[in-house]
Structures are given as C-alpha cells and as structure tokens.
Amino acid sequence: MGGEKSKDYTFGKMIIQILSREEIIEKYLKLEKENEKLKKEKEALEKELRKYKNPNTPPSANQHLKPSYIKEINVKPHKRGAPPGHKGTTRAKKETLNVRHICGEECPNCQSEDFQVIGCKLQQQEELPPEIQPETVNITRDICQCNKCHLKFLARDNQTPLQGKFGINLMVLIIFLKFIVRGVLRKTTSFLDASFALKLAPASVHAIIERAAKAGEAEYESLKQKIKSAKLLYIDETSFSVLGKNWWVWAFRSDTDLLLVIRNSRGNNVLEEILGKDYAGIVVCDCWRAYDFLINAFLQRCWAHLLRKSKELKSVAGRHFHKKLTALFDDIKKFNDKERTEKQRMRKYTKMTAKLQKIISYYSRYEECKSVTKYIDFHLESWFTCIKLAGVQPTNNYAEQAIRETVLVRKIIGAFRSNNGTKTYETLASLIATWQYQKLDIKKELCRMLSTNLC
C-alpha cells in the first residue's frame, strides 16, 4: 500500500480519483497549513477593522464605511433658487475712495488700436497689499522708583510685552495658525515667510506658543473651578501618545465651558483631581469603570455606546434585542420632547427601568447577548437619569464632539514630544474652545489675555 499511487476511475462523465494514503496525508497537511494561514490573516483583518468599527467609535468618524444609498426626498414643485428669507452670499458693497480705472489699449482679437468706448462695467474687489511686512519698533521703557514705597518698576502700556521680541498681534496670528488652522510648526514658519516676509525658526514659533500658554494659566485654573462647580457635565476621554507612551486626553464639557486635561492615567484619580471626591452634580459618560468613583453624582450612561454594541449582535435573538433597546431609546426622546413634572418623571423612570430589567432578564439566556446584558446590568440605575432629571441628554455626543478636535490634532502631529507640550495644548485648546462655545470673539479674547498677563 505504501508505494501505491492515485488511480482515476471513470463513471460516465464523472472522474473519481482514488488517492493513496501518503497522498491523502500530504494533501491534509497542505490544507491544514493553508487553513492556519487563512485564520491568521482573518484575525489580523478583524483586528484592523475593530479600530474603525467598535462601540466606542461613532459612525460619523468612519464615513467611508457607511453604505452608499440615495435618500428619496419628496419635494413639492417650486421655483429654483434660495428659499424665502435666505440672506444670500453676495457681499454688500463698501464705501471707498480707492478707485482704479482700467482703459482699453488694443483689440484682443486683431490687436488694432482703432476702437471706441461704448460703455463701462462696474465691479468692486477686496485685495491685500502685495507685501505685508511686520513693523519693527525700537522700545524705550522708563525705569521708575516709587517715592513712597521705594519700589523700582518698569513702565507699561498694556500693548507691548515686557519680554520677548514679538508683539501681541503677531502672537495672536501664530496661535490662530496653530490652533484654528491646525498648522504644524514647519508649515507655520513657511506661511509667515511667504505671506509676511517674516523669517522665524520652528523653535521660535514654539516658544511664542509656550509663552501664550503661560499667560493663560490663570484663566485655565479659573476654568477648572467653573467645571468643578458645574451642575451638569459631559465627560469623555481618548488616548494620545506622549513621548512614546500612552496618555489620555480627558474632556469635561458643561453648557458653556470645555476643559481638556492630558494625563498618563485613565483611572478615577483624574476625576478626583478635577472634580473632587464629593462631586454631586450630573455626569453623562460611557460605562468606563472609572466613573463609578463618582458615588455622589447622578450618572447618565451613554445610549449611543450601548446601541452601537447591540447593533453588532448578528443572531436572530440579537437583532430582536437591538430593536427592543432602540424602541426604549426612541421612547426616551419622545418623553423628553415635552415639559414634564417631577412626579411624571419619577413614575416614568421607575417604569422604564423595570422594563429594561425585564428585557435583559429575557435575553441573558442567549449566549451572544450576554456581554450586552451584563454591560447594561452593571449600571442598570443609570440608563434613565435623563428621564428622572430634566435637561440631561441620553447620549454623550456633546463630549464626543468636544474631543473630536483633539482627535484631528492627534492624526496630524501623531504624538506630543514633551511633557511641556501637553500643558501648552490643554491650556490654549481649552480656552479657545470655551470662547467658541460662548460665541466670543477669539481674537479679542486672546489680545485681552496676552495684554493683561504679558504687557
């Protein structure tokens, strides 16, 4: 048998191949090897896919993974153009004494100079000077001494920094390029050179940003106190590499303020540092266990995270489970659409919690659903705080939106290369985002902050 080879037998149009024992073993080992290779490739692909499709990543972050479809919208016949009340995009003309008359010189077709002017066309343009160069100022300060207390001091004018070679307006421009335009240091210096004939080294730009961050330290500390005393907070965190190690950016968002802190921990010690042990406000968050530290707070767990988890269930029972949870979420939104009394809210909270308990008790019998039912059960009393208390959102979208800018910065710069860089970023990014939420003029606020603390 050991030396036998395979034989072919023909039955009509079918050919059956009889393999020898050695050939069967050889083929089996080959298939087993291929199977192991395919398994490893599958695991690697699934691991890569989990970076984009997981319960902690919102669908908006992965537009390329969304199915392409055309949404049908029934529109009544109407005139083309902007809807009634639309302000339009045409810029209003401005009064100016600057006039330029362009005269004809020759026919563009035959180059003849024999032509006549039959009319004129009016237009208005806004233009920058061909060369915008920084102004160099030699500054002389009086050194004064008080005749009463004998204190020696330098004269100030609230517009000229006491130290450094760069003025307030230039510092504001550089901060705009870094934090609003998201420019990296090298490209920022290239832009300043091309646009303003201002030659700066990347190190100089970095020093200006650090000086601005130090000027904002007092306001940043004040912002911390506002967040600590806020009655309602939306909190989220995301990873960020610092000197090759995994750190975390925490976002604390209230109705009017945003605080970013960058720490080497994702634990409850960060919550204790920022909010204190006795924080008793309302916190909207995901189910990360660090938030359990806030024992005196009212916690609202994020329904967006939960529904993303349940949507991954592919079995029949899993799909039914997801539909039940989606119906509860829709019920929350419908209930909160109207004004409710405290009594109505407590009654609805009790009813909804009991209903959710019943649902997870039923679906916990299915193996695929167990991870989601446990996820819910660990925080059962925290899923309907938005029903019990008015003005609370059922999702943590506010915090996720607040931290999105930091995620974009992470994609651009990759990592912070110094501990100082984390302090600079968290200070200026927090202040700028807060001014944006409060609809303040960022340029004016930066000028005010820098003038107050540096001049």
Q: Predicted regions: what is each one?
A:
Residues V117-G119, L154-D157, V242-G244, L260-I262, ...:
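Short helix/loop capping segments that flank catalytic or ligand/cofactor-binding pockets
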Residues I168-V181:
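Short, amphipathic alpha-helical "recognition" segments used to contact nucleic acids or chromatin
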Residues R186-A197:
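DNA-recognition alpha helix
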Residues A290-L294, K323-C455:
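Acidic/histidine-rich catalytic cores and adjacent linkers
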Residues M1-L162, H206, K224, I235, ...:
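Short, flexible loop/hinge motifs at secondary-structure junctions
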Residues A44, K51, S195-S204, I208-R289, ...:
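RNase H-like nuclease fold core
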Residues L45, Y52, C107-P108, C146, ...:
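Mobile genetic element proteins and their domesticated derivatives, centered on retroelements
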Residues C287-R289, I295-K324:
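Conserved beta-strand -> loop -> alpha-helix junction used to position metal-binding or nucleic-acid-contacting
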